[in-house]
Amino acid sequence: VGENWRDVLAMMKQSFDENLLLPENSPLRYIAVGECGLDFYWSREFEREQLLAFEEQVKWSVEYKLPLMIHCRKAQNEMLHILKAYEKELPGGVFHCFTGNQKEAEAFLRFDKFCLGIGGVSTFKSSHLREDLPASVPLNRIVLETDSPYMAPVPYRGQRNESAFIGQVLHTLAESYGISNEEMAEVTNENVCRVFPVYAHFKANCKL
């Protein structure tokens, strides 16, 4: 038993409309659209459906002025093509689990209200992020992620990832940028509060 993807999108759209009726301070209010995006890593069998669904969700982000949480794997050109059509209207968001190179980072950062989400991969011995990020990405364009339960950072690699492991990512990036853990935490917390405006109301408690 399944649902046609168009029907699923229609139900999700209805949910967004209904959510707007909640008080602004309600803990049930949505804070973002996503995780959504494109993933052609395994197959392009449903490429058309993915493209249409992603663009529809980008439109929701614009309509409801909610940031996007974007997943993109082996689909960068297609994703950028869609986003460019709405570039001036996009409220911002996060390119989730970024593991790309300097050129890819620069392509993503053209969307000036977005940040790159950096997770456990940055701690892997084989990762180039420790060199590429300081060379091409300003600190105010980074947020920290775990991608729990996946991608556990060193020294927990191979285990189930936990939110508590975010400190390993923070320490790795602080060393890469040549700043203290405290400075990295402060900047990335500020970035989260900027990208997700709902957190600005809780700024004093916006700590890792």
PLM region spans:
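Mid-domain alpha/beta scaffold segments of enzyme catalytic cores
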Residues: 1-208
